[in-house]
UniProtKB/Swiss-Prot annotation:
GO biological process, one term: 3'-UTR-mediated mRNA destabilization
Region HEPN-C: start-end pairs: 329-401
Protein name: Roquin-1
SUPFAM superfamilies recorded: CCCH zinc finger, RING/U-box
Record keywords, A-Z: Cytoplasm, Metal-binding, Repeat, Repressor, RNA-binding, Transferase, Zinc, Zinc-finger
Amino acid sequence: MPVQAPQWTDFLSCPICTQTFDETIRKPISLGCGHTVCKMCLNKLHRKACPFDQTTINTDIELLPVNSALLQLVGAQVPEQQQITLCGGCGAEDTKHYEEARKCVEELALYLKPLSTARGVGLNSTTQSVLSRPMQRKLVTLVHCQLVEEEGRIRAMRAARSLGERTVTELILQHQNPQQLSSNLWAAVRARGCQFLGPAMQEEALKLVLLALEDGSALSRKVLVLFVVQRLEPRFPQASKTSIGHVVQLLYRASCFKVTKRDEDSSLMQLKEEFRTYEALRREHDSQIVQIAMEAGLRIAPDQWSSLLYGDQSHKSHMQSIIDKLQTPASFAQSVQELTIALQRTGDPANLNRLRPHLELLANIDPSPDAPPPTWEQLKDGLVAVKTVVHGLVDYIQNHSKKGTDQQQPPQHSKYKTYMCRDMKQRGGCPRGASCTFAHSQEELEKFRKMNKRLVPRRPLSASLGQLNEVGLPIGAPDEGPMDLPPRKPSGLPNGIVPGSSVTQLISRSTDSGFESVLKPVKLDHLSSSAPGSPPELLDSVPKTSMSALPVNAHPAASRDLPPLPVSKQIQMVPRGSQMYAPPPADTFYQECRGAGPPFDAAPYAQGVYYPPQSSQCVSRFVRPPPAATEPATAYLDHYTPYLQDRVVSTQYGTPTQQYQAIVPTQYQPHYDNRRAYPSNAPPYQREELVRASPVPLEMPPAAVSPYVAESRERYQGIEGYYTHPGQIRPSYHREPYIRLPPQHTAQPHPSLDDLHRRRKEIMAQLEERNVISPPPFAPSPTLPHSFHPEEYLDEELKIPGNFKGNDYSQYSPWSFDTFGPYIGTKDNKSKDVSAGGNVEVANVDGKSLRDQRIELQRRATEPGEDDLIPFGDRPTVSRFGAISRTSKALYQPPGPMQQAMAAHGAAKSSITDYSLYSSHSGLSGPSYPTHQNLPSQGHLSERERLSKPLPTSEREQLRMELQQVNQQISQQAQMRDMEVATNRLLLREASSLGNQQQPPPQQPPAKWPSKVSSKQLSLELHQVEREIGKRTRELSLESHSLSMKSKPDTIKVENGQLDDLPLSFSSEVPNGSGLTQDITLSKTASLTLSEDPQAGGDKSDLMRSGVNSTAAP
């Protein structure tokens, strides 16, 4: 197969002695046949004939003029005047025409000047010529013509015509849209019943056709097509009989077959003898496609042809030769007409119409070899015309073209010009010239090596940062410049420990397969030589399914108003191994895994919030399968999950509700294979304006990380194999993306009153859960509430239509489910599924540590010792049900004396506050936990150690300060609401006066409380609610009186008969009309429960001091 032939580029040296021309003894002498030889070699010839083609030299060698055009290219001194003796009948006019023609050739040769090197060998790519390689080849042919001899003049005229025709093609290409070339070409091919299947598949199909017919056998079209399809299917499954039949039709159209017709049967096709090699068959195939393009009026450059048909740039000369052979005398004139049409379409800004007379003159030249020799005047006119059109092309490319010479550059790849060219080092010149993919100078080498570092393929910025957040690697600030990824072999990830950091990095023990898909195919190397903040060498190998495995911020707009993340922050992870704690960190900082809330301003909560030192910050990333969300009708309201008895949620800015479908127990599979990737971890996708779980942008600060751990269920997914998440079941999985907040919500300067109430409620829930001691989790108490709360026991906020259907499956806990108890007691399940939960650290990987950690600590309190029965190796043993514990088989012990003592406090109290005993160890709502530093590596704590830890003062101070700030915000929002209330009442009064009837707002059904609450508590709560409602009513009355308005009968009855003047507008903004009452009731319930608990972490005065009772609205 012919490839790029570089011989024509050695035009500055003698082809016999291979020495560079000079002006002394190696003067270049051009012969009539078009070859140029130095004068020394020419004098050594035995006969007066060209040594290459044996063409007779008619003129005396001493009378042949020196090629001055080549001399000026090698930098030699050009003789000013040469004594030229023309034919005997030539006069002074002919000599004048000859001199003009020679000067035209010398001027055109100057376009080849950048191609010459100091030694005169090959090309120099550092100063690339403005002309394309086909133009350069044709120009070299013209320069080698000997104008003195008759044959040389004929060749010069043909070269001038060819150069002019190529100039027209170049101008047409400059006016074409390259994006439409391929589509127009394949449309023209398909219109003729043919097809091109792509470079690789087309080559295989042609080779299979040749394999079937190269021995001269005759096959019918149907048999030939079936043979090719059967052989192509293993490698190209998309091959079909129709497509292969179109390829055969293309060869049939190219007359490659000898067809034998048969009566009443299909014809037999036999490959012609001249096409029984692949090179010949492929050349005819390419010629047919080029001919179809020419018939369709398409002008395609050789480099474009090489890319289209072969997928590379090494077949340009092959395609150029095909184009040249397909040129006809009429094609030049047709090209001039096409150029005229293109200029009319574009308006001809460069005034290229002035070239049309010269182009028509060149088109009228007879290109046949038998044409009569031109006169000296015709030679002069032709060369002047070609000089004019070439100058016009160069001027257009330099001044008016949008492409310039960039289209001549080969496509850059990862190693483009990153090594020195061997020919340039050894010979001092490269025959490939500008198309060489190797560097020709040290400056060029360094330039492209630097560019190659920046051109390493990587993910988009948001995806890259999201991936870095998932694997817990440092992220640089936006102004750090380009991110370099030096090619180096990354090291492995031994046992989940990321090496190279000052603090041991840990990876979550969650059995979520989406997170494992991030770790397994990716080999991290934290110690790369790139700058701090640059990403590691893992972006290309990370599967796309892991992009949403760790949702950090469900609302990307929430981080726009936050300060940028410092570069020095080390974002750490918690591993799957047995190493549970970083050795020396003073504080542990946990991230809210439920996503940030609406984009509040960070200022209201910035004052008094404790931030740990940067050197020991450890932000855990949590894996949670995204739930199947059902979008409500009011899509832009901020709905929040209400506080339930076994779930503690607290976040710094409020957390949006995760809206789940109803949980149907029949949906669960018998076992959950943690090695399979379920669709719950699918990558985020965008559908119109609906966006879900987009990665954290670059400006994600630590301020958005809540110091409170939310409940999560991934910690015990191996145990929960009996009852898996509905989001992990593919047949019944349904995903609805979150709806982005509208602009008016994103510009909200302060949190709303509802959000502040919810925030206060969450803080109260934190304090409540921190001070209530629960009974042992494995005691089969009949009063344990079902984890799936019936609808009548849920708060009113759960009953919003469209927001919650059934129950929130994130409330599910295997320990509170009735049917799970028998499985815990069986020994067989200990060694299989249940044992997956035996290796539970106190590392708080997810929010599940609120109850799961205590289970683990109670179990290990009675263990005889470490690794006494199952001494496994260093690496974790993983079964298809999860990690196998490295501890003894005494997984679940009967409750000890301390547990029995705790169980005596009553089932009603324990059922509400279950799984919240060891919040001081779990890091629920405080960033500083000194107990972490005292824990052994395997997490073994005695019961006495756990119960003797009081609630840290810093945590209470933080909660108290935050609660004060929330109360201040509530007061501010309440004042704003009151102003709106007064205005709405005025409007309602006018409407009622017109309609003489006003429909009161629908009364909400009274809140149904769990039956476990005592009557004494209810009476106290009602008393406090009455005081609060009276205070609220007086404030509203004073506000109404100040605005000269009377109170309206828009009231809402509550359980005790008091009136609360809440207008319609207020009820429509809150999820239900009694949101304030519920908030107050919840806060009072929390304070009452805490005050009656004798074994809480602090007494009543402590609760008052930490802000528990200061919950009344101002």
